[in-house]
Amino acid sequence: MNMIKDFLIISCTGKNDKIGLKINNNFFIHDFQNKIQNNEILVSTILNLTNKHKVKIDQNFSILINNGPGSFSTIRVALSVAKGIKISNKVKLFGFKNSYLPQFILENIEVLINENLIE
């Protein structure tokens, strides 16, 4: 079982793009209305969400990233942003396949964390 408590989950595959933030046992979701075309939108949304909830992004924080399948460019943008956060803040980074998360809700994400993450 993984010891992932606080995390950012990025599920941007070109369709129903979302990010989620679990911090201090609270879970927040941001739905993107349009396909993520560039990293500026994703980065500013992540910064706004983490600043709003006063998140400390450090080695105790994890990022979960959807590896697809989906839009190659959208997945690349999301992965690049996640890797940038990993490098700059020394967070743990995990990937998952789109099929392992049938619905973007906390209960399903917790099952995903316990069973289907790729380090």
Role assignments for model-derived ranges:
Residues 1-40, 44, 52-55, 93-119:
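Oxyanion-binding and handling regions
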Residues 62-67, 72-93:
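DPxDG-like acidic metal-binding loop motif
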Residues 6, 59-62:
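Structural motif
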